[in-house]
Amino acid sequence: MKQYKSSHYIFNYNQYSKAEKDIIKISKYQEACYEYICNVLKIEPSFKIEYFLCDTPEEVGRIYGDDEPCNGFADLPNKIYAVYNEEVQCVGFHEDAHVISYLINRPNSCAIREGLAMYFDRKWWGIQNLDWTGYFINNNTYIAIEELLNDEVFFSYDCTITYPIMGAFTDWLIATYGIDLYLDFYKYENVFEGIQQVYKKIPKELNQMFVDYVNLFRIDELVEQRMDTLFHE
């Protein structure tokens, strides 16, 4: 693979690929994402993040070594494998947020870890996490936060539902209580203990406060129609 280096990244990509064509644009985009994540989390890696930009999900599995097709994932401490082609461009905030936030801690709940990554993403399929959460509440497909904090429950549902909910919840938590308290909470390995110690509430209470907040917003009719189409494809 060819290689391109920027201030905080090493990008590996195939010759004549879409990634090679766009490598300067990709580099500038990731550097901007990196700066924002570091500013919010108040931490900066001492290493460069190394991207492997692959043409297909199958190539991701082959280069990583497990032969499992995948669009993108972070391999700690500093590697990210991602598909980048004409149809799929798995770059942006998400995997970088994992790599950088794990320098603080890796809480024992996948919901919290993915929630922080989705907080930076803001959107799922181009639609705001908050709108998706309202849509799920209105259509009785919403899953309560206290349930999602359990990995067994979290993985039993499709990420189409769980990721936007946790992204919106994380956004609400940070906006309501501030980033400093959130970072204190993120340092707890046991998230149930962290919620009680930092926020002085139980997850069920926070969930109800969050749902009440989401219900303050009306979803635009055209956006809701688009969500219906995407969700049932």
Model-derived features: positions:
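Acidic/His/Gly-enriched intrinsically disordered linker/tail segments
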Residues: V60, D66-C70, I80, E87, ...
